[in-house]
């Protein structure tokens, strides 16, 4: 059974990208997959300080917040879903913070299948920019497959 982790970076509980996450979850659970949604706005996640403390501490960040729990879920997941609204022509600040905080483990994640959920109101070119942001992160994972590419 596949273990799916959805990272929802919408700051709005009933925002469009959050609704899409919930629909993805329903469909995956109907197929028998285990699904966890992490709503970043409901977690205490500090900004990366670029101190390299995690590199000196065997991959453990010096910040004591909810990110350690999320990274553990991230490592165990077979499938990763990154969901973001587009704000001011790019991924949400919450998604960027999440990506930055994966620094201690991003090179040691193993094989992942990755999906994106991006919601925007301004058109396809705006979504393309956000795809570039997410691709820049995912393409540096150890072993990945972006679904649909």
List each model region and its residues.
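Short glycine-rich anion-binding loops that position phosphate/pyrophosphate groups of nucleotides
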Residues: 86-88, 121-122
